[in-house]
Amino acid sequence: YDLGMNLTHLSLTTPINANWAMAVALRPYSMVDYKSSYTRQIVGAENQIVNFDNVNSGGVTRVSYVNSLRFFKDLYLGVEAAYNFGTIQKDSSSYLFGLQTNQLRNSTRYTLNGASLKLGLAYQHRLSDKWRINAGASTEISGNLKGDVLKTFGSYSDAGNGPVLVSIADTTLFSAINGTTPAQQRIGVSVESPFHWVFAADYHSTKWSNNQSIEKGLK
C-alpha cells in the first residue's frame, strides 16, 4: 500500500472590509530536479571507462504575506512581503567499468534564506453590460539570499540496496554564502466578457544580468 501526494500551492485569503483583503501563501519559488549521466574513456586503458552520475534536487520555497487595497472603485494596489528558504543538494558520483559497487561521491548542500518585496497595481473598467477591460502591472525588487554551503567527499559501497557510506565523509568546504533573487516586471491587459470570452496579452521580464549567483557569493 503506497500513498503519494504533491502540494505545490497553499493560500488563505480573507477580506478585512469592502476595500481591503489580506492573504498568506506557501508555494515553490524555484525547484531543482534533474539527473545526468555520462562516461569517459580511461587514458591508457583500452575499452575501459569511468561512469559519472549527477543528481540535483531541492529548491527554494516562498511564504508570502499579501495586502490588497481598492481605491476609487476600479483601482487596486497590492503589496507582497515574502520570505524565501530552502535547501539544494547536488551529488556527483563516479565509478569504474559500469559497476556501482564502489563509488566516489562529491556532495554539495546549499542552505538558503532571505526576504523579498513585490508591488502590484491593477485597473478594471466596465465597457458595457457584457464587456470590461483589465490592466495590471507588477514589479519584484531584487532580494538578498544568504546561508551556507557544505561540500563533502566520501566513498560508498552499493550491494544492490543503494549506496552506503564506507567511512565518515571528508568535509572539503563549509562556508557562508550570499546571492540575490532576480528583479522581475510584469505587465498585462485583457478584454473579457465574464464567463464567456477573454482576450489577453502580457509581457514578463526577468533581469538576470545583475543577479549574483550563490557560487560567486562564497565568503
Give the role of each language-model region.
Residues 1-219:
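Subset of outer-membrane beta-barrel
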